[in-house]
Design a protein with these regions (language model features):
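Membrane-embedded beta-strand positions of outer-membrane beta-barrel proteins
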Residues: 32-33, 66, 95, 115-117, ...
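Surface-exposed coil loops of outer-membrane beta-barrel proteins
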Residues: 2-3, 45-46, 69-140, 149, ...
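Residues on the lipid-exposed face of transmembrane beta-strands in outer-membrane beta-barrel proteins
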Residues: 19-23, 53-57, 66, 93-99, ...
C-alpha cells in the first residue's frame, strides 16, 4: 500500500500488525495483507480484517487484476484527484492490454499505448451505498521522456440512485462530456443518473540518468457549457503539479517529492 491506505488515526495509543503474504502460480501473482489489532485506541472499533487480497496475471492478450487493493491513477502516487494510495483498497476487476500496442492511422503518432478498464463496487458505508465506479484509462508515450494519460470515471448506481434504461447506462459511459449528452435527450434525463469525471495527466523525465521528473494532472467534474469556462476550470476542476527527485545523495531508497494541489469547491460535490 501507498500512504495510509485509508487507515484511520485512532484516539490514544493503538497498535496493529499487518502481516502480508505473496506467492505466484504460473504467470499469476497473488498478494494478501491482514490487519490484526494488538492494542486498540480509545476510539477504535477495528477488528481483524483483510486490507488487501488480490491476484493479477495475463489472460491471452489481456492483463487482469481481481480483488481488493488500492487503485493508483496518474503520476501522483499518494494524492491523485480520483484514485490514490491514501484511500482504502477497492473491491474491483481491472482488465487491460498485456503490454503496449499502436493505435491505427494517424493515432499511431502518439506512440506505444496501454488501455485499461476497471469496475469497482463501493461499500455500504459510503455516501451512496453499494454504488459503482467504472474507470477508463489510456496511457501513451509519444516520446521517450514523456508519458501522457487520458482518463474517465463514471460513478453511478447504488441505493437511492435514479433508475435508467440499459441504453441510457451504455450511452452515459460512452459520452463523458456533459454538453454532448444533450444530443437526442431534450429533457437531459441521463445527466441525473451518474457523476462523471474526465481528465489528463503527464510525466516528463528530464533526459539524463537519475534526473528529476516533472508531472501534472487536470481533472474535471462534469464539464459544463462553453460559456461557463470560468466555472469549469475553477469550481469544477482539480489541479496537481509536482516534481519527483530520485536518488538523493546517491541512495536509491531516498527521494524528494514537491507537489502543489488545488481543488475547486464543486469537485466531488455534484
Amino acid at each position: 500500500s501507498q500512504g495510509r491506505g485509508g487507515r484511520r488515526i485512532e484516539e490514544g495509543f493503538s497498535m496493529v500488525a499487518e502481516p502480508s503474504m505473496g506467492f505466484a502460480v504460473g504467470d499469476w501473482d497473488f498478494y494478501k495483507v491482514v490487519a490484526i489489532p494488538i492494542d486498540k485506541g480509545q476510539s477504535s472499533s477495528q477488528s481483524v480484517g483483510i486490507e488487501e487480497i488480490w491476484g493479477e496475471g495475463p489472460v491471452g492478450p489481456l492483463y487482469m487484476s481481481v480483488g481488493r487493493h488500492p487503485n493508483v491513477w496518474g503520476p501522483s502516487l499518494k494524492n491523485g484527484s480520483l484514485f490514490s494510495g491514501q484511500a482504502r483498497g477497492l473491491d474491483q476487476i481491472t482488465v487491460g492490454s498485456d503490454g503496449t500496442f499502436r493505435l491505427p492511422w494517424i493515432l499511431e503518432k502518439i506512440g506505444p499505448t496501454r488501455l485499461s478498464v476497471s469496475l469497482s463496487r463501493l461499500e455500504k458505508d459510503r455516501n451512496i451505498p453499494n454504488s459503482y465506479l467504472v474507470g477508463y484509462r489510456l496511457n501513451a508515450k509519444p516520446w521517450r521522456s514523456l508519458e501522457v494519460g487520458l482518463l474517465a470515471l463514471v460513478h453511478s448506481g447504488g441505493e437511492g440512485s435514479p433508475s435508467a434504461s440499459v441504453w441510457s447506462r451504455v450511452l452515459d459511459h460512452l459520452i463523458v462530456v456533459e454538453p454532448l449528452t444533450r444530443l437526442g435527450t431534450p429533457e437531459r434525463q441521463r445527466l441525473a443518473i451518474s457523476n462523471r469525471f474526465a481528465g489528463l495527466d503527464f510525466r516528463w523525465r528530464l533526459p539524463w540518468e537519475t534526473a528529476p521528473q516533472i508531472y501534472g494532472s487536470l481533472v474535471f467534474d462534469d464539464l459544463g457549457k462553453p460559456d461557463q469556462l470560468d466555472r469549469v476550470f475553477g469550481q469544477d476542476a482539480s489541479y496537481i503539479v509536482g516534481m519527483f527527485v530520485p536518488h538523493i545523495l546517491g541512495n536509491d531508497s531516498q527521494y524528494m517529492r514537491f507537489e502543489y494541489r488545488e481543488t475547486g469547491i464543486r469537485f466531488y460535490a455534484h
